[in-house]
């Protein structure tokens, strides 16, 4: 969808250790694809605006790591700034696409929350928490924001649209 992609920048709240792990895995995967990778370390809300200074000269696209605190709270601002800089964005949760992000691929959080409720129910009925097997997410959603794609001058290939779980107009 982004044919000119050679330089990928990863943005994340590095105060969150899971984000640090996510960035490490993304860095390795991007390098394996031959992409030049840079990182934007966000620690507080004020870092978001500063992060975009000169970013267009250093990046072809932006991957925004999922974070329940700083990044999620500023997702609309991040996507607005990225769109202003003509930078396509990729995210790990659909709510970021609702906030103007180009694409997301990640676990279906409502499904995960329902599964969590099932665990709570089992525990309240007497099951021992330590005896309940750990589960990994089983449903992942690909979401594409066509309005953002158009604003960036990008076209989503028909095959990609056919794979999408949701297309936001």
Walk through the language-model features, giving the residues of each.
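Short hydrophobic alpha-helices and adjacent helix-cap/hinge residues
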Residues: 1-169
């Amino acid at each position: 969808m982004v044919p000119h992609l050679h330089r990928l920048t990863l943005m994340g709240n590095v105060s969150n250790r899971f984000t640090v792990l996510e960035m490490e895995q993304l860095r390795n995967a991007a390098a394996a694809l031959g992409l030049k990778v840079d990182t934007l370390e966000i620690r507080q809300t004020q870092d978001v605006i500063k992060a975009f200074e000169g970013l267009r000269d250093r990046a072809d696209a932006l991957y925004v790591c999922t974070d329940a605190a700083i990044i999620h709270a500023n997702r609309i601002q991040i996507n607005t700034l990225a769109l202003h800089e003509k930078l396509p964005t990729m995210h790990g949760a659909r709510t970021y696409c609702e906030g103007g992000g180009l694409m997301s691929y990640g676990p279906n959080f409502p499904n995960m929350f329902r599964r969590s409720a099932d665990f709570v129910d089992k525990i309240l009925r007497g099951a021992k928490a330590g005896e309940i097997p750990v589960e990994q997410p089983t449903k992942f959603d690909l979401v594409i924001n066509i309005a953002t794609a158009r604003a960036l001058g990008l076209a989503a290939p028909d095959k990609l649209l056919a794979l999408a779980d949701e297309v936001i107009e």
